[in-house]
Amino acid sequence: MIEKTILNYLNSALNAPVYMENPPRPPLSYVVIEKTGSSRANGLNHSMMTFKSYAGSMYGAAQLNEAVKYAMDGADSLKQVTSSRLNSDYNYTETSTKRYRYQAVYDIWHY
């Protein structure tokens, strides 16, 4: 399961915890990953994944987002991943709660 592979990889690569859902008592800075779509062709899987970087400030969320992108740009070093490419990233602050976050979207090709 690519989600578990990426979760483990990012937890070892980042200085902030990474989850697959928002924790009940979230730390100040953390990342939530989610697979938003997938396809398969010629035995190769493609998954689109989002990476939501939360922090106590806009700057902190942007910094964490950059760390996520740096790590994900190297995810093709994993034996299950053949390619990891940034699709888009942007400010994704929750306006109703003022929780600062950035979101990066990646296309990941994997076995």
Language-model region placement:
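Charged, amphipathic alpha-helical segments and their flanking helix caps
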Residues: 1-16, 25, 34-111
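Polyanion-binding surfaces on beta-sheet-dominated domains and ring/shell assemblies
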Residues: 21-23
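Histone-fold modules and their flanking histone-like tails across chromatin and transcription assemblies
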Residues: 27-29
